[in-house]
């Protein structure tokens, strides 16, 4: 008598409509067909209404003004208006990621501090900020803080000629001159030499079993080579522009010079940094706690200081836990920047809404946003 007990015979006897692998492929095929059907149906309805699908409107005159970002006038095209929105979003997201990471790292470490007061302050900040909607925080920062600051005539002046008023913040700024192009190779050379020295230093110290970081080896070439180039070339490659309050003949007071951060940009950046920093602090705290306690005890037995333990042992091992959720927080910060429309900051979403209303190109504008 033949016995059918083999595993291979059992698999060959399973009907295809019950095979999990076949069902997965069929489900994907059905999904693709449904998506294509929806796209084709939407496109046919779109064309059936006499509408045309084209991005040629981007070359048309925008006929509206944008007060935030790079230079723009109503005679510029929709394409440049969209570029203004993209650059504004990149500005606030890039700076927000840098400052929120620093704030989150410091707060996360402070949350685990042995100092009772520091730990409680960090915990209070995290709990309050995480449980308050970001839009509420933006409204508070913009309407109750920024707009309540003194006007330009009575602006708060901080050391270094930093002006703070209800129109925003004005900072001193370095601006390149015609000699900057001759100085640029020295900057690039300094960066290359610093990276090479750091790699060589790190490999050598790792072979000896010593700490692998030395700020001196990075700082010397980064400072000496650009300074040498500054002395060799003719003219200053960069000039420091200091802001100052001036009164125009029409009686209007304004601040000239430096770089200006508008009140909307300041409120949005501050809100995103404070809000996202609280979440990053919890990510950092979870990553530090994931490192076994024995690592810290062994480092103390070897005579490491608390700073060395954190920098050389705890944080490098905690990165495997920190990085995945940290990237999610970066994406959340970028997406949350669309709330800028609540305080009239001209980010990508706000500019796109204006383009949509002016041109009537709904599908094209949303495709640009998605891209």
Give, region by region, the residue ranges found by the protein language model.
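Transmembrane alpha-helices and adjacent helix-loop boundaries
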Residues: 2-371
